[in-house]
């Protein structure tokens, strides 16, 4: 099995960054797919054998009974029938066990098929996070964090909706958290990345369906509000129930021995049935209405909690999660198992004959209500914390899998400084793979970098490279660079403005609103890196240039730092007016018979543009 350590021994330092190391991962996942496909097929063949054996052993039972009834000395046939019955039970047990093994093998097969597809740049089998797209967010919309082909989709292995929400929250929030917190997250991710079998087993539980955390929490919160008389918890009620069951047993024995009329135990059983039904049926109906559909989800949660609790993880954040669900003061496993058994009891109430029998003889509904109340009092206050802990672990599994799948990435150095620090060597965009061209770039606090260049020269991709790698770094993930040193700061982008015709907002008005939002954000959080692609898109060139100058002059009065890509070469003269704050960089192209794109950033102002050249070439071809 490949490990992170083996992969990180080799780092590409060339401008062209091949991902040939990922061929090892592709080979590993391919072998896992082949293994579990073969295993599932073997188990399915065994299942057919069990079905045949089960049928034959079952048919032996009536045959043996028939021979026993017709034979003079049929004791041997009776024994044979008993053995056939025991054989049938054993085969059914093995068949049930084999069925679970088939399901587990198929789930793991699905896990590894998805990872194999990931290595082949097919991310369609992972949730895209479209529900989290927000054009007004400070940076996620511009940096392609959510949606088809997004960073979230590449990372997302979550199997609970709570885990998905937690992962989305991590990627959408880069508030100035302590460096120690980032290091703690990194250690947890690194440890989980090295536990590939644990991650695969965890993900296997969500291959058939996603566990809806919101539905479970909603149901459990409703349970919390269900008002049931606490009398069922009292010793008096327990004594009364015990007395009723005991009297029924005594009167039944007396009636069976001829010492009492049979009418008395029957009448007592009927009275007990109506008493229990009157006292408990309404309460159990409320409970069943709320949680009756949760059984499948709860069983899955029990499996996840068992898996987490049994893991031997040492990293601080991982230990926090384990302690939260299986510490001395809490017992999530016992809680969910008790709730699952309660749901089993509720399911069994659908059998009317059984309900009448067990309530008449054993007051079963009373004990079901009593068990529920005890569970509600003991465990209900902890449920939300346990589910939140599982959601955190679910999100960490996704982050760790991303780290494992991208062995060419390296850990960033996070420095604890009260200013914007961003020093990158050989940085490139994580989506580009072997097509990526790396660049060196350094951002100083409260400085502004104006980047010029022709269309398609690489400006926008470079801006996203800066933003996405920072986002990875502060989430404790490795970055796509030879080396990256960053401090912790806020991030705000303006790259992909959209109009909103439903609210009467034009494209240009949307651009102004975005810049206003940016200014307000910088005033709230002075240590901010702003990334802008073409200020004031949607107006004429001269107005755009003057407006851009005015905006940059105003933003320069704030304690912010920025990178601004533009086609307006005149805007580069800001560096002449304020050389201590503004700096020019460019992506140059070479024009000859064809255009050569280097995708390398260099100091200075771009000299060559390509719009007219490309248009003329297009017209000539027609």
Report residues per predicted region.
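Low-complexity, intrinsically disordered or signal/transmembrane-proximal segments
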Residues: 8-11, 16-19
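Alpha-helical coupling/stalk and coiled-coil linker elements that connect catalytic or binding modules
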Residues: 20-454, 462-491, 513-514
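ATPase nucleotide-binding head domains, primarily ABC-like/P-loop NTPase cores
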Residues: 399-402, 406-622
